[in-house]
Amino acid sequence: MKIIIDAMGGDFAPEAPVRGALLAREKYGADIILTGRTADILRELEKAGCKEVPQGIEIANAEEVVEICDDPATAFKQKKDSSLTVGLNLLRDGQADGFISAGSTGALLAGATLVVKRIRGLRRAALAPTIPTMTGKAVLIDCGANAECTSEYLLQFAYLGSYYAEKVLGIVQPRVGLLNIGAEPSKGDTLRRETYARLKEAGGQGHLNFIGNIEANTALAGGCDVIVADGYSGNIMLKSVEGAAKLMSGELKKMLTKSAKTKLAYLLLKDGLADFKKMLDPNEVGGTALLGISRPVVKAHGSSNAAAFCNAVRQTIAVAESGIIADITQNVDKMKITPEKD
């Protein structure tokens, strides 16, 4: 398995991507292509103790970088020698099995759509992070790729999320819920009501295990396995979950270290608290799958450290090996979406 990593994307590039590549090579045996400025990558490899480029690691030179402040709509086209563009071109040409970037989300979405292409028949690609719930995990789709959606897009997202939950996470007959302000079918705006009708019809035909509308608190309690949302609502939910996790971890630590008695309790609970913190840590997940693209693409968090990049490689391998893209391609007709003309 060969994975491409954008070595210039993210807050801690190129150090975090390069060191993450070395960890992934050691832990998963994956071959890695690092795209970016060769001199910068070699410098980081040297800092990591590598006197030469290790076996299983390749460098694809790219002199330009798509910055987070660049306009996503134009940056990808203007910077043709960027680490992002070079990596996506390699993926399109079949030089690797997947691509990871912690750079600009908008540029990655635009580049993946224009270069690697969506699966024929799909209207939009969507970001599908895995979030923790009280009973395990759930797929949240979309969480920022599409701020404005139609009911057709959300129907498509439900299928994509369901395939991901089943094929990658191993959930049998994943329960699909529509993120809304109430559980009743009449709740929500026009988009939510129209989407509810489409999802209910798909559920009646046995194509989806649709359980109805679901509120955010119920979803986090484990009420469903796939949370369907437009990118605007989904992103707010995701950021709220991340913020709440930081709040809980910080407050819990303060409570358990404010006196001698609580410090003793902290020592007794230390291992359990470490597991709790690990469950809430986005670096443990690795990244967010960009579903609907014809090859595996994963968006790593902008603040990803080396461990996060390593975990993103694990996740990308899981997507590549799952057969999810082939399954989606073969079942587009179920989604009631007429293929667009090339």
Protein language model regions, located:
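Glycine-rich phosphate-binding loop
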Residues: 90-109, 187, 192-198, 202-275
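Short beta-strand segments
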Residues: 6, 35-36, 58-60, 101-103, ...
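Phosphate/nucleotide-donor binding subsite
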Residues: 50-96
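Glycine-rich phosphate/nucleotide-binding loop
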Residues: 113-127, 132-140, 223-227, 231-341
